[in-house]
Amino acid sequence: MVLPLLTRLDHVGIACRDLRRAIDMYRETFGLGVLSLEENEEQGVREAMLAVGPAGAGPGSLGVGYIQLLEPLSPDTPVGRFIARRGEGIHHVGYGVADIKEALATVAGTGIRLVDERPRHGSMGASIAFLHPGDLGGVLTELVQPLS
């Protein structure tokens, strides 16, 4: 039997025009606080990670998932173009993997197109890679290997 490639639902990425306003809405509505606030120039976003689950549990912990709020640094970034075409909302779904390089090789072997052929830097020190939404029911999918 082959072990499942995906270890958990890691996060839902949500594109927003105003990161501060989105953070305030999630705090006031759901009581969620910011776990991490970063600017990722490679991906062209300012982002906030909000933990959903047991208080005090760290990245990669079972039972903890995240909401990742993404504000584009400019209109010509992937998230900026997404908002221009579709408006604010769900941008992608991220799944945890134990070994991102192995996961990419396995997925590529099935014929699924890779957006990223090699892992790159993600939130909170994770290694990440995206899979093409055209091969996955229209869902942009992110593989996430949390920082150990």
Label every PLM stretch briefly.
Residues 2-4, 17-23, 48-50, 58-62, 73-148:
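Vicinal oxygen chelate
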Residues 22, 33, 58, 63-67, ...:
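Short loop/beta submotifs within extracellular cysteine-rich repeat domains
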Residues 1-45, 77:
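Long, hydrophobic N-terminal alpha-helical segment
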Residues 9-16, 26, 50, 62-70, ...:
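Short, structured motif recognition centered on aromatic/hydrophobic residues
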Residues 72-75, 146-148:
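A short, sequence-level motif marking secondary-structure junctions
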